C-alpha cells in the first residue's frame, strides 16, 4: 500500500484543490506476463471538521484512507474549500469536481479505475457532503458527478435546524452564509434529506446514540431514502463516538460488506469484512 499526497484535482476561488491517493499494493510485477487486472472500484473520501477546519492528512482520516486501500479499494481523500472564506455550495462543488476529475480518461488509466464504480465515504461535515454527492449527483454514472454507493458517518442530513443541537446551529449557519434559520434558503439545498429520489445510490448510514448529530436526524434521512425505494442500511452505534471515531472492527467489517455488495470486491482484494 502506498500514499501519493497532494495531487491537484482542480482550482477554484484562487485555491488549489488537492487530494491524497491511498493505493492498494500492486497486483502485477513489472516482469509479469499476466494480463492487466480489471479496472477497480474506488472511493472518494471526505473529511469532517464542521466545514471550517480539518485536512485530508489528519491522522484519523489518513488511517481510514489506508484501511480502505489495504482492503483493495483505491481511495482518494479530498480537501475542499471551507468557511468562512467559502460558503455553501463551494465545498459541494469541489467534491463533485473530484468525482469528475477521477473519471477523466487520464486518471482512469493512471489508477486503473472503473468509472461506473466510484463510491463515497464521509464523516461529520464530510458525511453531509458525501450524502449530497449521493442525492444531487448528475449525469451518466460513467461521466458525471454521480457515485454508486455512499457511506455516511454522523453526517448532518437536515440543516434547517429542525432537530439540531443548539450549539451546532451557529456552525451550520456559518457554512450556509446565513444570519439566522428564519431566512436561509441555502439550508434546504445543503440538506440531503430534501433531495432524496428513487435513483439515488445505495446508502450506509451510521450514527451514535448520544453524539453531536442527533440520531433521530440520521434515522429520518434513512427513512426518507427507504421510502423512495433506495437500498439503505442504518446502523445505530451505542455511545457518544462521532464520525470516524465510531469505526471499530465490527462497523469496519459491515462497511466493507456494503461496498462488496454495491460496487464489488476488486480482484485480489481481501474478503469482505477483512481489515
What is each PLM-predicted segment?
Residues 1-275:
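Alpha/beta-hydrolase superfamily serine-hydrolase fold, recognizing
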